Amino acid sequence: MTAQHTILKIRRPDDWHIHLRDDRMLETVLPYTSRFFGRAIVMPNLTPPITSVASAIAYRQRILAAVPQGDNFHPLMTCYLTDTLDANEIVSGFEQGVFTAAKLYPANATTNSSHGVTSVATISGILEKMQKIGMPLLIHGEVTDPAIDIFDREARFIETILEPLRQDFPELKVVLEHITTKEAAEYVIAGNDYLAATITPQHLMFNRNHMLVGGIRTHLYCLPILKRNTHQQALREAVASGCDRLFLGTDSAPHAKHRKESSCGCAGVFNAQAALSTYATVFEEMNALDKLEAFCSLNGPRFYGLPVNDSWIELHREAVTFPEEIALGDESLIPFLAGQSLNWSVR
C-alpha cells in the first residue's frame, strides 16, 4: 500500500462473503461489487440452495452474464451443506474447480437456511473428506436452540459446536463468518493457521444501540445481530491488531424495501456500495490505515491459497454520499448508510 497525502492505493480487494441473490436482484446488486472487487465468495442459500456441481455451474454462468462490460470479476462458488449431501459431490466440485468452499448453515439460523445441517455428526464424513483435500468450511456460527438468547448464540456456538468440531478435524480449514463478539474475536486470534474469520462493515461501525435506540432501524437488522458496544470495540481492536487470519467479508445481503420495512422484516444489510468506504473509515478511526490493505486484499487470498489480484484501486479521502434508494424494477432497495456521507471514496 502506498499513501500520498489523501490517497491510498491498495491491491484490488476481494469479498470473502456475499449474497448476490438471483434474477433481477442479481442484476441490480452485482455491479456494486464487480466494480471494485476482483473476486467474491458467493453464498449458496438460494431457493432451492446450491447443492450440486451442476447448479453451481449454472449459477456462476448467470452471475458472469450479469457482470457489466469492463469489470473483471470472478465469482467463487460454494456448496450448501445438508444432512443428506453426497460427499462425492463436494469432492468432485472442488477438484473440478467449481466449488471453492462449502457452507455450513445450522438449520434455520438465518435467511434460507431451512435445508441446513441439523447436527455436525450427520456431515462428519463430508468434513473428513474436506479436511483431506484442503477444502475450506465456511460457518454461520450461531446455535439455533430457542432457549438461547439471540445475543448469546454466537458465543455458545463456539463453545459447544465449533471447538469440538475443530478438535475432531484439526486440519480442516475453517472460516467463522461475520463474527460479532469479543469471544469470537479472541477465539480466532488465539487460533492456529487453520482458523480464520470475516468481519462486516456494519459490525465494525455500529452496535445494537444504533439499531434500537430512538426507534427501530430495520435496515441495520442482520444475522448475527448487532451486539453491545463492548463487542463492537473488540472487533475494531481485532482488525487494528493486524491479525492475518481476519479478512474482508461484507455479508452484503439485499432485500427489497418492503421486505425490510414490515412487521416481520428480513435479516440482511445491503452494504456493497459503501463497504470499502466504511472499512477505511473504521481503520482510520483506529489509527490502523497501514493494516487496511492486508485486511481487504492480502489475508483472504493467503488463507485460501489463491494469488492476490494484480490490479489496484484508490481510496481518496474526500466526502462521498450514498444513495437514499436503489431502483429494483418496480421496487427498491435501501442501501447501508442511505443518504449519509463518509470521508473515503473509492476509484
Swiss-Prot record:
Binding site residues for Zn(2+) 2: K103, H140, H178
Binding site for substrate: H19, L20, R21, N45, H140, L223, H255, A267
Cofactor remark from the record: Binds 2 Zn(2+) ions per subunit.
Keywords, comma-separated and alphabetical: Hydrolase, Metal-binding, Pyrimidine biosynthesis, Zinc
Record-listed E.C. numbers: 3.5.2.3
Calcium in keyword set: no
Pfam families (UniProt xref): Amidohydro_1
Gene Ontology biological process terms from the UniProt entry: 'de novo' pyrimidine nucleobase biosynthetic process; 'de novo' UMP biosynthetic process
Modified residues (N6-carboxylysine): K103
Cofactor: Zn(2+)
An example Gene Ontology CC term for this record: cytosol
NCBIfam families, per database record: pyrC_dimer
Quaternary structure annotation from Swiss-Prot or TrEMBL: Homodimer.
Protein name: Dihydroorotase
Organism: Pectobacterium atrosepticum (strain SCRI 1043 / ATCC BAA-672)
